[in-house]
A protein has these predicted regions:
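Structural motif
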Residues: 1, 309, 332-341, 379-382, ...
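Basic, nucleic-acid-interacting segments
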Residues: 1-295, 306, 312, 333-337, ...
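Amphipathic alpha-helical core segments of compact helical bundles
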Residues: 16, 195, 199, 230, ...
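C-terminal non-catalytic interaction appendages of large macromolecular assemblies
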Residues: 142-147, 185-192, 202, 411-476
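Core structural elements
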Residues: 188-200, 268, 306-329, 338-356, ...
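Extended, non-catalytic structural segments that build the interaction scaffolds
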Residues: 285-292, 329-334, 370-382
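M16/insulysin-pitrilysin zinc metalloprotease superfamily fold
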Residues: 334-335, 341, 349-364, 372-377, ...
Length: 476
């Protein structure tokens, strides 16, 4: 490998608290602009911040889930910069003494399992939302100003765009399981900035770090990193130098575009936040928070493999969403062939419906009807293909499985005497296929099974038909 890709991520996650981080204003997306505001989040004279305790609790949960050290003491800082989205002229954040430090998240990397290190998870406040009009005006909605955020800062351990996407998918799934954020990128409750550069492994030369913003999807993150890697390789190969810059991702053009020279920490003139006290949290308080945490995806995967005997890959799919996992376990209480259940959920249910953690997942028919269908397949009352036909009609009409099976006449023929009669007829009518089979042409058997199914109008049990054909072909 001539070039090594070096990627770090900065992920901002809005927390789903009822009120903002430092005032009692409602934390609610989509409300009428500038209705959830007060002297504190508008920085009017006399407005003083008071920390929302749930912000601390939620951050401790995230830190625990991502294997961080939870610090008993942490402090807030002021990040100074002038922009209309911050009326104070500074953002309340945590710079050098965050509540959660030194964590990691393990993912399936490009070369196997890999731990992506985390520098820290810090508490901070969000900024107002800028709205640009066709008249070239910029309007500000301060409803978002002061909404609680956690910023998750990774170490530069990510080696490709794909690894970054996998990391973000797992991080989002974990946060959703914790129920501390809805992680909707389209609403801005999960945002990601990328820092990327490359190193020539032969000379040790590195390119300057580029920060990429305006990434509104995980696929966009992956593509932006891949684009920047190629751009940085060209910089090295052409012996061009570039200072640290901030660029934005243009999804339509599939390229990054220069925004500005990148700020450094000194540009923000970080200073301690004097209006907020040191955050103290005891080991007992941390334990109380951790004890109330729900089962996390990795824990659920281990349990699914152990309790249900399904593959780790299948368990990973089923544990990718709280609602999907709940759906599987509800069905597993009454249907014990867990592999068949898992396969049908993944191949037939998930391609028809999108399961979201925002609302309880329900089929357009009762769960017991789906179990009735699976029992019919398992007992070989109907074939697998017939089962797919039945499920399709169940989704279209909401009718029960048995009702559709009976109405369409899909019950398999299992009478061996009846199937034997059809097999004999097929063999008598296809002498050439018998010759082909004896000459070792495997396709001949498939053709003969197809003829049996055709004569039986799809009702013959294909397993019985196949076994009977092989037996009779050997006898001829």
């Amino acid at each position: 490998m001539k070039y090594k890709t070096i990627v770090g991520l900065e992920i901002h996650v809005e927390l789903s608290t009822e009120t903002k981080a430092f005032c009692s204003c409602k934390n609610s997306f989509g409300d009428e602009p500038n209705t959830n505001v007060c002297p504190v989040c508008l920085a009017l004279p006399g407005g003083m911040p008071v920390l929302n305790r749930n912000v601390v609790n939620y951050t401790v949960m995230a830190g625990t889930a991502f294997n961080c050290k939870i610090n008993n003491k942490s402090k807030f800082d002021r990040k100074n910069y002038f922009y209309p989205d911050l009326t104070k002229g500074f953002q309340i954040t945590q710079n050098d003494n965050a509540i959660c430090t030194d964590g990691y998240l393990e993912i399936e990397g490009d070369e196997g399992n890999k731990k992506i290190g985390l520098f820290q998870i810090q508490m901070e406040e969000d900024t107002a939302k800028s709205l640009h009009t066709e008249e070239n005006e910029t309007l500000m909605d301060y409803n978002r100003c002061g909404v609680p955020l956690i910023e998750i800062v990774t170490k530069p351990d990510i080696s490709s765009g794909k690894e970054a996407r996998v990391f973000l998918e797992k991080l989002k799934s974990t946060l959703r399981f914790l129920d501390i954020s809805d992680c909707k990128m389209e609403e801005g409750s999960l945002r990601c900035d990328v820092n990327v550069n490359i190193k020539d492994m032969e000379t040790g030369e590195k390119t300057a770090i580029t920060e990429v913003k305006n990434l509104n999807s995980f696929r966009g993150v992956e593509k932006a990193i891949d684009f920047e890697v190629e751009r940085h390789i060209k910089l090295l190969e052409n012996h061009e130098e570039e200072i640290r810059t901030t660029r934005r991702w243009d999804d339509a053009k599939n390229e990054t575009i220069l925004m500005r020279v990148k700020y450094t920490a000194s540009d923000y003139r970080f200073a301690p936040e004097g209006d907020l006290p040191i955050v103290h949290i005891t080991d007992e308080e941390i334990k109380e928070i951790v004890d109330k945490m729900p089962e996390l995806p990795d824990q659920m995967i281990e349990r699914f493999v152990k309790d249900y005997g399904i593959t780790r890959e299948d368990a990973g799919v089923l544990a990718s969403s709280r609602e999907l996992a709940k759906f599987f376990e509800d069905l597993a209480k009454n249907f014990k062939d867990y592999t068949l259940l898992s396969n049908w959920i993944q191949t037939e249910i998930l391609r028809r419906v999108e399961i979201s953690d925002e609302e309880e997942f329900k089929l357009p028919f009762e769960n017991k009807e789906f179990i009735e269908l699976l029992n019919s397949i398992k007992s070989e009352k109907i074939s697998n293909n017939a089962g797919k036909k039945v499920l399709r009609q169940m989704f279209e009409t909401g009718e029960g499985a048995k009702e559709i099976i009976d109405k369409l006449g899909l019950v398999q023929m299992t009478d061996t005497f009846a199937i034997e009669k059809i097999v004999d007829e097929v063999l008598d009518e296809n002498e050439q296929s018998i010759i082909d089979f004896k000459e070792g042409k495997d396709r001949a058997l498939g053709f003969l099974v197809g003829q049996v199914m055709k004569k039986s109008r799809g009702k013959a049990n294909p397993k019985i038909a196949n076994e009977m054909l092989v037996k009779k072909l050997k006898e001829r």
